[in-house]
């Protein structure tokens, strides 16, 4: 029997001796809302708009315009007002009726300001009044018709 204490453990001198290079491990990640190309809209949609903003918009005048563009996969587009002025933003949640808007569709809409500065406008309660002639229109359920 020896009266000497055992030597203290020494740190490894090479990474393979502690198993860093031997077994690759997948990094555990917390769920992210940005995974799967789902990006939250920075603009108020029908679901996130406040009650007071909805009431103000519904009491406003009805405007006429033409759909300048609309991307179903992105969920938004723009309307060119019939009386001129800058294009108006259109979110997918504010389109009424069964058809996806396409370029050239005549629409009616009301307007709501976009927070936080309330300097820009967004079209709400959008209704397609005349389908653009000679174009294919898709319903929200995926059926395609020609107009």
From Swiss-Prot:
Its main location: cytoplasm. Widely expressed. Residues 62-129 form the CSD domain. The lineage of its organism: Eukaryota, Metazoa, Chordata, Craniata, Vertebrata. The modification Phosphothreonine is found at residue 45. This is Calcium-regulated heat stable protein 1. Transmembrane segments: none annotated. The modification Phosphoserine is found at residues 30, 32, 41, 52, 58, 146-147. Binds mRNA and regulates the stability of target mRNA. GO terms for molecular function: mRNA 3'-UTR binding. Homodimer. Interacts with STYX. GO terms for cellular component: cytoplasm; cytoplasmic exosome (RNase complex); cytosol; P granule; P-body. InterPro entries: Ca-reg_mRNA-binding_domain, CSD, CSD_CS, CSP_DNA-bd, NA-bd_OB-fold. Can be phosphorylated by DYRK2 (in vitro). Dephosphorylated by calcineurin in a Ca(2+) dependent manner, and probably by PP2A or PP4 serine phosphatases in cAMP- and PKC-mediated pathways. The modification N-acetylserine is found at residue 2. Residues 1-49 are annotated as: Disordered. PANTHER family: CALCIUM-REGULATED HEAT STABLE PROTEIN CRHSP-24-RELATED, CALCIUM-REGULATED HEAT-STABLE PROTEIN 1. Keywords: Acetylation, Cytoplasm, Phosphoprotein, RNA-binding. The gene is Carhsp1. It comes from Rattus norvegicus. Residues 1-12 have a biased composition (Pro residues). One of its GO terms (biological process) is regulation of mRNA stability. It is found in: Cytoplasm; Cytoplasm, P-body; Cytoplasmic granule. Pfam families: CSD.
């Amino acid at each position: 029997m020896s009266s000497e204490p055992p030597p203290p453990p020494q740190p490894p001198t090479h990474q393979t001796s502690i198993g860093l290079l031997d077994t690759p491990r997948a990094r555990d990640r917390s769920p992210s809302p940005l995974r799967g190309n789902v990006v939250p809209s920075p603009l108020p949609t029908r679901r996130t708009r406040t009650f007071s903003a909805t009431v103000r918009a519904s009491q406003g005048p009805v405007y006429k315009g033409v759909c300048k563009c609309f991307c179903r996969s992105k969920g938004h587009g723009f309307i060119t007002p019939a009386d001129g002025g800058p294009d108006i933003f259109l979110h997918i949640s504010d389109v009424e009726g069964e058809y996806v808007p396409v370029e050239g569709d005549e629409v009616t809409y009301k307007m709501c300001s976009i927070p936080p500065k309330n300097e820009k406008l967004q079209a709400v309660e959008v209704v397609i009044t005349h389908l653009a002639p000679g174009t294919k229109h898709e319903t929200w359920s995926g059926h395609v018709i020609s107009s």
